[in-house]
Amino acid sequence: MKIFAILGASASGKSALGLRLAKELECFILSLDSLSIYQEINIASAKPSKEELLSIRHFGIDLLTPNEPSNAALFAHLFEEALEASNQAGKKALLLVGGTGFFLKRIIEGLSPAPTLDPSAKEWLKEVLENRREAFKELEKIDPLYTSRITPSDLHRLRRGWEIYLGSGLSPSLFFETHPPKPLGHDLKIYELTLERELLRQRITERTEQMLESGLIDEVCQLESRYTREPQAMKSIGIAETLAYLDGEISKEELTPLISTHTAQLAKRQTTFNKTQFTSIRHLEAPRLFEEICHTITKS
């Protein structure tokens, strides 16, 4: 089975291209998006529509509530799940589509397997993490090297450190040393969907306007009411600026250009990351990218 990763900046059209390819190749899609994995964050994430999700099986969408943590390990697990489902269904290809190249990098490099916790340990840890500063101090006594690389507010890594210690009896640093990551054992072709800069900026602005017309402000109000502003997802582009508007820090007229500017800055960082991290990546416009992937499947 062939595995293709299609990366691209926000608003580049990668999701639409991925859907078109998935329909053509009759394959599944693993979404590599840090927001689409959350339920209820529909407008801010610009996730595929309900109809599109029904037409093509997706992995990595609507799995978590906004107050649950997401991390690279979860996407590595989702990749294995999508790969197994594709093999069982006799698919010829699997598409990985999204803007978060960091998740793809972790899938390729592999992750150290995290030990499992029994229910009582999970409950104990949940209570401990209610006071992150104290949880950090206690973990610091166990592994000062590990905690020197994180902060008390880094809930994802703080939780992972405790899970490793409780599940294995080893300090996180020693666990990582004795349980090295297992690299991806599958052939993977990586593409980046390219667009002329001014066209991308125009699309970003248009998408931002569409998000606001579709009810972004109401969505953010509901999310804040249910989950507060504490979860990491609530600090994402689109949500953070809307909260600033609700606080009276910016006007409604300033909201669209501010979200657009931050999205464009993110797009630039995404492109830079992809160029530096994936040496074999191919940069193609949509028609050529579509044609090349289809040709690869046809000749196999």
Curated annotation (Swiss-Prot):
Keyword Aminoacyl-tRNA synthetase belongs to the record: no
Residues covered by region (Interaction with substrate tRNA): 33-36
Gene Ontology molecular function: ATP binding; tRNA dimethylallyltransferase activity
InterPro entries with a match to the protein in the record: Dimethylallyltransferase, IPT, P-loop_NTPase
Site note Interaction with substrate tRNA, residues: T100
Residues the record lists as binding ATP: G8, A9, S10, A11, S12, G13, K14, S15
EC number(s) from the headed UniProt entry: 2.5.1.75
Biological processes per GO annotation: tRNA modification
Cofactor(s) the protein requires to work: Mg(2+)
Catalysis performed (reactions): adenosine(37) in tRNA + dimethylallyl diphosphate = N(6)-dimethylallyladenosine(37) in tRNA + diphosphate
Pfam family, one: IPPT
Broad class of enzyme this protein falls into: transferase
UniProt binding sites for substrate: S10, A11, S12, G13, K14, S15
Protein function: Catalyzes the transfer of a dimethylallyl group onto the adenine at position 37 in tRNAs that read codons beginning with uridine, leading to the formation of N6-(dimethylallyl)adenosine (i(6)A).
NCBIfam families associated with the record: miaA
HAMAP family found in the cross-reference section: IPP_trans (MF_00185)
Family of this protein: Belongs to the IPP transferase family.
Quaternary structure (record): Monomer.
Listed name of the protein: tRNA dimethylallyltransferase
Gene: miaA
